[in-house]
């Protein structure tokens, strides 16, 4: 049984849903509007009794049918209301009959009602103005700057006592000035302190006196009726410090007829002869002048009058007038639109499908012309083997030969072949035999020997320049090229000239061992072009090594070994030529950048490790001297 009993009962929660699923015609419009789909769906999702899947499917069908009926009824009501509104507001249609084309006067006229304007106005006390404007009214303390009663600087200028910021004792009583203004000295600390208990009797006595009675006595130190610092400023009877000041009578504030500075200066030492305050220290240094704190006003009303504040009008930024930009071409012509429609190059691309098999995919990746001389037929995962393969396929021609060949200055064929076959092999030294005449032979009869290095050639050329200048024939023009199979004949020197050339070295004084400064040019005898060629060649080799190995340690060691061998060969030639016993690293690294100096220093350390040279240094950070080691001529 795929349904439950409560579904079929007329009182069940899903009775209307089941009826809509199986007998839709039995449902009336009232039944549809009474049905609550939300509660019905909740009952289907979480039923009280387990239902079969087919039963829940039937109930969902009933829910859809009831929802469809509700939507259909709503659409019908909307259409009916729309038609009625449209019919009611048709243009040109008057619903009035023929006899009632004119409207009644009362229907189109508003009644005139004159109100009684003689009613008394409400009392002003009924309106609570303070309550309405209390939010917009600020307190006096918030909008008024705090102003201290001016401190009199006369007391501080004339050493009337120690009036520091921390003094709490009031000046001696009974001191007043004759025919002077009422001088009140208050500091920030005195205003904020409470009166002490020792002056309570004095405060009670002073409360009964008027302002003008305080200054009756003219003598200093006799009267006990008043003091310079009025206790009423300290007491709390007249309000807070920042409250409105009490109204003073005109007789209370007296203006001085003449300044009393002269009298006060004369009586500095005599009048105030009483003891100082216990907090003061003798001798008392005069306090700096504070003229900004003294305020003397001639009128009582202007005592607390503030200066008017300028009304600052907020400046409004002037709006920049917008510039109307109109396109010159407002519409596209038919040719442009047709060209855009016919151009479909941006949505069409070539079909590039991957090969169906992995082998074809590999052939496609490695079968291009750019990969033929770079990758072997089989994949080599070892980086060193791959580099050896590419090295064999792409022979390295020295840069100097390449440039000489391009410039039309190539030497004979066997010299070019020797450098082509062994571009990286360090060449052995060949002792120059300049003074021994050799018979001229053909190229075929000569044995194949290695060409001396460029460094040795430069040393030899520097030594025989003077000899060849007198015996060399004039050079041929630059446009004439040498033939590949011929060697230029050596200049024939008569034996008389040879004897004359051999005589001058005998007459020279004995040679002295050259200095380090003379030794360094022997290592730096390479021409500028040769140096540039070697530098470019080293940079290319470093880039190739970095690209191929990716930081392989073996390749790094190989590159350093090559630089070390070049340094050793240069040292051997230079020391053999000059006869020096040592060489300075500082002189060797002169006129070089930081990278080249570091490479030479590292080469020295490697040669020291191999016992090819010996390094000595007198003190830290001083020059390093290199001398030949036990294996200097063996390596």
From Swiss-Prot:
Post-translational modification: Cleaved by separase/ESPL1 at the onset of anaphase; this cleavage is required for sister chromatid separation and cytokinesis. Cleaved by caspase-3/CASP3 or caspase-7/CASP7 at the beginning of apoptosis. Phosphorylated; becomes hyperphosphorylated in M phase of cell cycle. The large dissociation of cohesin from chromosome arms during prophase may be partly due to its phosphorylation by PLK1.
Tissue localization of expression: Widely expressed with highest levels in testis, brain, kidney, heart and thymus. Lowest levels in skeletal muscle.
Cellular component GO terms held in the UniProt record: chromatin; chromosome, centromeric region; cohesin complex; condensed nuclear chromosome; cytosol; midbody; mitotic cohesin complex; nuclear matrix
Pfam family, one: Rad21_Rec8
Modified residues (Phosphoserine): 46, 153, 175, 249, 458, 549
Crosslink (Glycyl lysine isopeptide (Lys-Gly) (interchain with G-Cter in SUMO2)) position: 48, 216, 418
Residues carrying the site annotation Cleavage: 172-173, 279-280, 454-455
Gene Ontology MF term list: cis-regulatory region sequence-specific DNA binding; DNA-binding transcription factor binding; lncRNA binding
Listed Low complexity bias regions: 274-283, 431-440
Keywords: Activator, Apoptosis, Cell cycle, Cell division, Centromere, Chromosome, Chromosome partition, Cytoplasm, Developmental protein, DNA damage, DNA repair, Isopeptide bond, Mitosis, Nucleus, Phosphoprotein, Transcription, Transcription regulation, Ubl conjugation
Top-level taxon of origin: Eukaryota
Region (Required for interaction with SMARCA5): 126-282
Region (Interaction with WAPL and PDS5B): 287-403
Region annotation Interaction with STAG1: where it falls in the sequence: 362-403
InterPro entries: NXP1_M-like, Rad21/Rec8-like, Rad21/Rec8_C_eu, Rad21_Rec8_N, ScpA-like_C, WH_DNA-bd_sf
Biased composition, class Acidic residues, residue ranges: 537-555
Stretch list, region Interaction with NIPBL: 154-171
Disordered: annotated span: 258-285, 423-496, 521-563
PANTHER family according to UniProt: DOUBLE-STRAND-BREAK REPAIR PROTEIN RAD21 HOMOLOG, SCC1 / RAD21 FAMILY MEMBER
Family from the record: Belongs to the rad21 family.
Other known facts: Seems to bind calcium.
Domain remarks: The C-terminal part associates with the ATPase head of SMC1A, while the N-terminal part binds to the ATPase head of SMC3.
Name assigned to this protein: Double-strand-break repair protein rad21 homolog
């Amino acid at each position: 049984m795929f349904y439950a009993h409560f579904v079929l009962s007329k009182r069940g929660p899903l009775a209307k849903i089941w009826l809509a699923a199986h007998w839709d015609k039995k449902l009336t419009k009232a039944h549809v509007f009474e049905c609550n789909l939300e509660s019905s769906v909740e009952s289907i999702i979480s039923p009280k009794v387990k239902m079969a899947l087919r039963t829940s499917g039937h109930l969902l069908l009933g829910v859809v049918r009831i929802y469809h009926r509700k939507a259909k009824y709503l659409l019908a009501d909307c259409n009916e209301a729309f038609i009625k509104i449209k019919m009611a507001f048709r243009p040109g249609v008057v619903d009035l009959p023929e006899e009632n084309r004119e409207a009644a006067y009362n229907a189109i006229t508003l009644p005139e009602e004159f109100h009684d304007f003689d009613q008394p106005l409400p009392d002003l006390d009924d309106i609570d103005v303070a309550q309405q404007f209390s939010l917009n009214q600020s307190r006096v303390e918030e909008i008024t700057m705090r102003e201290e009663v001016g401190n009199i600087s006369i007391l501080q200028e004339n050493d009337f006592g120690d009036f520091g910021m921390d003094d709490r004792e009031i000046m001696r009583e009974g001191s007043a000035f004759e025919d002077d203004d009422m001088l009140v000295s208050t500091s920030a600390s005195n205003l904020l302190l409470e009166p002490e208990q020792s002056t309570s009797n004095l405060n009670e006595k002073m409360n009964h006196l008027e302002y003008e009675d305080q200054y009756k006595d003219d003598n200093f130190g006799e009267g006990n009726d008043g003091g310079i610092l009025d206790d009423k400023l300290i007491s709390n009877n007249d309000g807070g410090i920042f409250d409105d000041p009490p109204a003073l009578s005109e007789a209370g504030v007296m203006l001085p007829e003449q300044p009393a500075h002269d009298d006060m200066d004369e009586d500095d030492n005599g009048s105030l002869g009483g003891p100082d305050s216990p907090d003061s220290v003798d001798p008392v240094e005069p306090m700096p002048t504070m003229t900004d704190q003294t305020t003397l006003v001639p009128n009582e009303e202007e005592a607390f009058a503030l200066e008017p504040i300028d009304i600052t009008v907020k400046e409004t930024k002037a709006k920049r007038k917008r510039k109307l930009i109109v396109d010159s071409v407002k519409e596209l012509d038919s040719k442009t639109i047709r060209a855009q429609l016919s151009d479909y190059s941006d949505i069409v691309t070539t079909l590039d499908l991957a090969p169906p098999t992995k082998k074809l995919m590999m052939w496609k990746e490695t079968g291009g012309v750019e990969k033929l001389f770079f990758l072997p037929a089989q994949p080599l995962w070892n980086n060193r083997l791959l580099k050896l393969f590419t090295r064999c396929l792409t022979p390295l021609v020295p840069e100097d030969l390449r440039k000489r060949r391009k410039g039309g200055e190539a030497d004979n064929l066997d010299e070019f072949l020797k450098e082509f076959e062994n571009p990286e092999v360090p060449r052995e030294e060949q002792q120059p035999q300049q003074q021994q005449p050799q018979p001229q032979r053909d190229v075929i009869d000569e044995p194949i020997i290695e060409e001396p290095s460029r460094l040795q050639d430069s040393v030899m050329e520097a030594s025989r320049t003077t000899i060849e200048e007198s015996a060399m024939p004039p050079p041929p023009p630059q446009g004439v090229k040498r033939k590949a199979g011929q060697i230029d004949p050596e200049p024939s020197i008569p034996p008389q000239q040879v004897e004359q050339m051999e005589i001058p070295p005998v007459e020279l004084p004995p040679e002295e061992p050259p200095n380090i400064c003379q030794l360094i040019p022997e290592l730096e005898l390479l021409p500028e072009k040769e140096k540039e060629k070697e530098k470019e060649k080293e940079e290319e080799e470093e880039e190739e090594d970095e690209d191929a190995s990716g930081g392989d340690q073996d390749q790094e060691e190989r590159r350093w070994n090559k630089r070390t061998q070049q340094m050793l060969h240069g040292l051997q030639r230079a020391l053999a030529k000059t006869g020096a016993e040592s060489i300075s690293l500082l002189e060797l690294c002169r006129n070089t950048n930081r990278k080249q100096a570091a490479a030479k220093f590292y080469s020295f350390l490697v040669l020291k490790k191999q016992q090819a040279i010996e390094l000595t240094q007198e003190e830290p950070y001083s020059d390093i001297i290199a001398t030949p080691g036990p294996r200097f001529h063996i390596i």
